[in-house]
Curated annotation (Swiss-Prot):
One BP annotation, GO: negative regulation of cell adhesion
Coiled-coil features, chain-numbered ranges: none
Main location: nucleus
UniProt entry keywords in alphabetical sequence: DNA damage, DNA-binding, Nucleus, Repressor, Transcription, Transcription regulation, Virulence
Biased segments, Polar residues type: 1-11, 20-34, 85-114, 199-211, 384-393
Region feature (Disordered): 1-121, 134-170, 195-230, 368-411, 783-806
Pfam families: BCD_RFX, RFX_DNA_binding
Protein's name in the database: Transcriptional regulator RFX1
Amino acid sequence: MSSDQTPQNRNRGGDDSYNPRLQQQTSQIPSTGPDQGQQRERSQEQESDHEHQQAQQHLHQFQQSNLTPSTTAFPSSTSIPTFSKQDQGYHNQFSSPQSSYRKIGNFAQSSNAPFLNEPHPIYATNYQQNVPSQSQFQFDYSSPYIGQSQSQSQSQSQAQPQPHPQPQTYQQLPHYSQASVSSLPPTYQAFHSMHEASSADNDSATNITTPQKRKKQKRSESVTPNTGENELKQLALRSSNIPLSELAQKVKQLENDSTTTSVSLEQSKMKENKETQRQLFGMVWLLNSCDLAPTAVIPRNRIYARYVQVCADNNLAPVSPASFGKLVKILYPNITTRRLGMRGQSKYHYCGIKLTGDENMQSQLLNYQQKQKHQSQEQYNQQAQVGSSTSSAGLAGHQSPMSSCNSSVSYEESPGPIISRAHTPSFSPINTPTISMSKSLNDQLPSISHMKFIPNLFYLLNSNVATSSNPHEPIQLPSIYPYLSKDADHDIADTLYSLYKVHVNSIFEALRYMQLKKLFSSFSTFNNILTAPVLKLYTTESLAEWVMKCDLIMYKKMIRMLSKLQLQLLIPQEQLLQLKQIADGYIKTLSTSLINSKVSQNFVMMKLKLAKHFVNLLNRLIKVIETGQPASRILNDDNEKNTMTQDWMKLDIHGIICREMPCNDNNIDTLTYILTGEVVNLIKVKSDNEQAPTMSDFANYISNLPSRFPEVNTRLFLLLASNLLTTCLREISLSGGEGFGAWWIVRCWIDEYLAWSFEVGGFFQDDLQEIVAQQQLNVQLPPPSLSSLPQTQQQNPVIQEETGTQEESLGNIDLLETSFDFDAKTSQPYQQPSHTESLLNFETNIDNLLN
């Protein structure tokens, strides 16, 4: 049989007798005579005989195949039926696509019945009401779609059954009882039982998988996989009397131990213990800060904001909001959570719990906000008065900006408006004719090309001045409330303030203890802990300036801490390599985290601008250390200093100054005295009774040279000093001096150290501008002499002992407490035995420095 003669194709219109639409059309045409009726009967009889033969062939192939289900589909081989014409009529009725394929499609595709893939007749399963008993296979195939003449011809030949055309719409067949199924032949009963079994299996599988998924979700919501909720709750109840500071110290100790542990098993145990201690810290705080109250209602984010604030005060990273909510449910399982508030401004609230002293905290918050507004208004008035008075005084000057001793640090080369924003005036140097106010805080930060000379800069940085950037003091961020909009949520703002404080402290601590992995991962950790409302507030335009101020405070503390390393010439190469890795990967890591967080372009540029300035200063410090190490060996070697002195005495200093340094007579005299007298006295070999200068003496003398020329601009001084040294080295080289190599190494260090001191001065000019103004106007300090420099340097260790409060046990290295150089009051001329003794003391005093 061809594909066009299959029952499916005939039902789709392959034959006119199986097309209901054509049958309806033929019913409207009157009969033309008995000849046409007889021809139609003969064609139907031939067609039914052909189908009967085809069915016999299918059964024969079915019996010969290896997949014959002798025990499943048929009771025995003798029970395979032979189809008569009546059976063929039954087959035609239930083999249409609408009745059979719709109901047993799943069974035909099941792996339990692969023999159904063979081309054999397919039978329906739900057929009880339309099927008579096995002995009655006479069906009435009359249809309302068949015409009158056609129905008369069918009544004359009832033994000739023809298929009944099915309607075009699908109908749900009714469910049949087991009694009606038993009246069917065994073959059909077998097919029905197999279909019912496969359907039951599918239904049971569907019913089983759904509860399992829910159980997995419930397991994932457990607090910890190793410690049960009851054990954690009992541990928190027993630890409720322990101070939070002790718990926080234990968590930080575990965090530091996990960074130094190399074994994977021990590291995993440390991590699990650390997470347990962090959860314990949160639960102890909940027990001490929250009380049960049946009528109390409090916003859920307010409790989390107070918890994050406590973590920030103890310099501890908080858990995520979801994990904190689980801790609340463990301690207080009977409280409920409801969403309350106006439409569009509703929040989730805890019902049945309250914060102790929350009313007093809210009143203090309102008073603090009013105080901040009052202080900002007073600051605006004072800065406006200072700007007007300074601008009027500066107009009386006659010097040019490029010739003054101080330069403007505004990013914009062209002057901006006289007054822009009250809290962002750029620092204006003294004795400049014009005052330019920057448009925003972005312009206030000095770039690499804006430098400033501050007398006794590093002495001031090592003292207690400018506590906001003092690395020994905790980081205090500016208030966030003046930068909030009117409709901002203060609980979310408090959460952001505390989270960012923790973030800034974590970066500073990672650099302090040289934990590079923690430093680079802190950016992504901060982005992951921010919820959607906090992230939205964090990236708003109004808070960009607050974020910039916070980052600027952090970078100032970091540079102030790193400035101690400028003369610590015994720093190990491992730590120097780590500083290089930070300088190389800091910008890349920060930019990647900002791009992944999908913040605005202006926000990204602001963050990267500050980070780039920090990296530039760090690179300059690395160059100072690298050039200072060989320079210190030369300046502490008597033979090298004798050779350098002999070559220097051969130079025509007065001729070089007149040719290379165009300046007035006073500056020529001062410069001649410095090069012919002070430099020679500084590098010549001392007698046994005299104390040789140290590297700190050389550094302080060089950094205070610009104070001898107050009219020269800082950048101009740097260029002229480099040009003068280059000319002197060229003359030494042309004369064949043996000390050319030593002078070249020392000259490289002088260039780097001068640039470093000027860049650091420009970076901290806002913090030290009041002290600089006092020095310039009232109590200007004289340039330190060689005899007074060691006394100045002696005060630094005392200050560090008073302000240093951190424990050295938290890390292998502490940049605040560790010293890599000789003490100034016990410094001796650099010789090989002295160096060996100092290195021995260095390795003895610093525990685990080189792991």
